[in-house]
């Protein structure tokens, strides 16, 4: 097995799905958290000048959070067994990534704690919030129905086994639920799924011990 180094800021953000996959698989890795004071000096070392980035054996670099997550999910057995199962895990994961991406854009627009602020007009925060809310209205009902297709929604998206899709449901909705605890009130199966992910023995241990960050 290669040695892994995960490069990202000291946030959950777009790297958290990879951390959850490492935890679920019980695989050790170097969780390199970059401080803002370091970033400008090392930006050019990163593919596309962006993070997160997954490094294997100190030589192979994989950028783009979902490409990284899919690689790890395949390596660790959390990506489905057949091509059709993997396609299902992928579209579910991508749907939740859309929610997470819009939330992070909204957070960046509206929260001065964000490390990098874009120039913006006075309406950008409300516009990004409207986009996030519309994305949730579009995706969450579909995810509730998709979950219901396996065992009436009483297990995981792929049935008995937890996959990357279930972990994406957890991490994409974590911060939004902190802000609006009732956002899943119309989606009880998704809420129960998040509780099952939290209760998974390795996930439970990881969530208790991980670094505490704002997002």
From Swiss-Prot:
Query: Which residue intervals define the domain GST N-terminal in the entry?
Result: 2-80
Read off the InterPro entries from this record: Glutathione-S-Trfase_C-like (IPR010987), Glutathione-S-Trfase_C_sf (IPR036282), Glutathione_S-Trfase_N (IPR004045), GST_C (IPR004046), GST_superfamily (IPR050213), S-crystallin (IPR003083), Thioredoxin-like_sf (IPR036249)
Keyword terms:
Eye lens protein
* MF GO annotations: glutathione transferase activity; structural constituent of eye lens
Q: Which cystines does this chain contain?
A: none
SUPFAM superfamilies given in the database record:
GST C-terminal domain-like, Thioredoxin-like
- Gene3D superfamilies xref list: 1.20.1050.10, Glutaredoxin
User: Which PROSITE patterns does the entry mention?
Assistant: GST_CTER, GST_NTER
- Reported tissue expression: Lens.
A GO BP term here is: glutathione metabolic process
Show where the GST C-terminal domain sits.
Answer: 82-215
Purpose: S-crystallins are structural components of squids and octopi eye lens. Contains relatively little if any GST activity.
Assigned protein family: Belongs to the GST superfamily.
What protein name is recorded for this chain? S-crystallin 3
Source organism (scientific name): Enteroctopus dofleini
């Amino acid at each position: 097995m290669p040695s892994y180094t995960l490069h990202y800021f000291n946030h959950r953000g777009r790297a958290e799905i990879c951390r959850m996959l490492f935890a679920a698989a019980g695989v050790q890795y170097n969780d390199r958290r970059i401080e803002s004071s370091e970033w400008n000096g090392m930006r050019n070392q990163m593919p596309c000048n962006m993070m997160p980035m997954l490094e294997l054996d100190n030589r192979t670099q994989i950028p783009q959070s979902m490409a990284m997550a899919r690689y790890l999910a395949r390596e660790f057995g959390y990506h489905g067994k057949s091509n059709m199962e993997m396609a299902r895990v992928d579209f579910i994961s991508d749907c939740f990534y859309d929610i997470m991406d819009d939330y992070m854009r909204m957070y960046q627009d509206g929260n001065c704690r964000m490390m990098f602020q874009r120039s913006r007009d006075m309406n950008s925060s409300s516009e990004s919030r409207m986009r996030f809310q519309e994305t949730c209205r579009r995706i969450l009902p579909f995810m509730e129905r998709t979950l219901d297709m396996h065992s009436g929604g009483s297990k995981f998206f792929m049935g008995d086994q937890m996959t990357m899709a279930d972990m994406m449901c957890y991490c994409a909705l974590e911060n939004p639920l902190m802000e609006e605890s009732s956002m899943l009130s119309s989606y009880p199966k998704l809420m129960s799924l998040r509780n099952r992910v939290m209760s998974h023995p390795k996930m439970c241990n990881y969530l208790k011990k991980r670094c505490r960050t704002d997002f």
